[in-house]
């Protein structure tokens, strides 16, 4: 079952996302914004800036501004904002958020056209889903990226 705006706001009140802007809540998702840290996947260089322009063929890791906490009874799926897809940006199919995850999300972007991104702009939508039952071991006990902040290379 996908959470609606009312349930998302309740999740937020229980510490689900920080910082929180109520304008980012949609009927069945919450927008998450771009942070200011990036890793160029071509050369491994790390950047901290308010704006980044991706050239065609460029691939980067980025991070969300928001730190999220997914309780063991929820999971999430991340989708690129369609306005960015229409500009030629792809988000790699690594958009699953396990129950029990806490941290900023690492985003894998690939540009097909020149695209300029601003820190603080909404870039993805997080859709939260209710689990039938809690897992035996949630991500807080098993995950390699639990508690991450900033873009994180593969471990």
Predicted feature residues:
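DUTPase catalytic domain/fold
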Residues: 1-155
